[in-house]
Amino acid sequence: MRLLFSFCFFFFMIIFTATAYDPLDPSGNITIKWDIMSWTADGYVATVTMNNFQIYRHIQNPGWTLGWTWAKKEVIWSMVGAQTTEQGDCSKFKGNVPHCCKKTPTVVDLLPGVPYNQQFSNCCKGGVIGAWGQDPSAAVSQFQVSAGLAGTTNKTVKLPKNFTLLGPGPGYTCGPAKIVPSTVFLTTDKRRKTQALMTWNVTCTYSQFLARKHPSCCVSFSSFYNDTITPCPSCACGCENKKSCVKADSKILTKKGLNTPKKDNTPLLQCTHHMCPVRVHWHVKTNYKDYWRVKIAITNFNYRMNHTLWTLAIQHPNLNNVTQVFSFDYKPVSPYGSINDTGMFYGTKFYNDLLMEAGPSGNVQSEVLLQKDQKTFTFKQGWAFPRKVYFNGDECMLPPPDSYPFLPNSAQGNFASFSLTILLLLFISIW
């Protein structure tokens, strides 16, 4: 029986990892589109567009890295809006030297502020791409590539293969390039349509299991009806960094350059029992007759990373009746149509859309007012706490259900007794 269970578990993990299925965003992906805009003497000029169709997962600093393998002996003569990280061996070329001669080029976005003649539309953001649900206009990145020693017709062009995408770390798996109907463009005066000479798409999906072996965030709970605070589970994000963590009152925090990110993105975490870079706290704050109020706080424990354009996705049955969100922006997420139990919180632009590194300013918070559905609302059995929590697209570890702040058994009895006492005093005063 144990052997059968183990087999089923590993089979499920393989399927889950291979399909990279996210139950709260089942159709989320990053689509990379190549549009050949013109032919050249020995190849073509193509516009490469990366569209992030993930509702609440974005690519943050240090940005995306795109790679592929050329099918033949192609080279990159030039690029606009991006660059390869290595030129490779171009010694066989005399006169004009290509931008890149590697069989497997690696491409990154340009940084903001580059000269105008190096810029392209939707480029030069340091590889940062917003989430589609947060801001569709920011969920795109583009560059132009001029390929040489390639085909010069639709029949002679060979599609690149073995696409890879880092965003910024591992986790994405890309499928093969597929020829699709040519993209149609509308001129600026909107009176004429043009189309690409040839178009192919590459679809990349994300799997948290491939990205890391431990969660990157955890969740803690508290409530007004119980003094118990349910903390994040111990070592929720693994304790590998326990030896290199820094205490909150350590003098090393005054050292200059402490917050400068490392090239390998090694974190510098504050010493905690959970050792997570980010903690989400859900506090059931107030109970009204027709409404109830929750306070959400996000705390950063990483001294070397801040989070731009952060997102927080939460699944809770009462999110179908959100009345007001006070300090965050909010959008409902309904991946299954009629089931409206998931929402995405994110920072208000120019106010709290940047979660600073660990320290006094390393937190953002907001309160949420929800209307009660009297048929389902209860404080019993942990109903008031979320079912799933995602920060920046990665699922956070929740405490075990038996540790949730419980509603005292005598709460309802005490309330009834209190109400009876008030009525009795009122009756005596009138009498």
Curated annotation (Swiss-Prot):
Residues 1-20 form the signal peptide. It is a lipid-anchor; GPI-anchor. Keywords: Cell membrane, Glycoprotein, GPI-anchor, Lipoprotein, Membrane, Signal. It is found in: Cell membrane. Residues 415-431 form a propeptide. A lipid is attached at residue 414 (GPI-anchor amidated asparagine). Belongs to the COBRA family. This is COBRA-like protein 4. It comes from Arabidopsis thaliana.
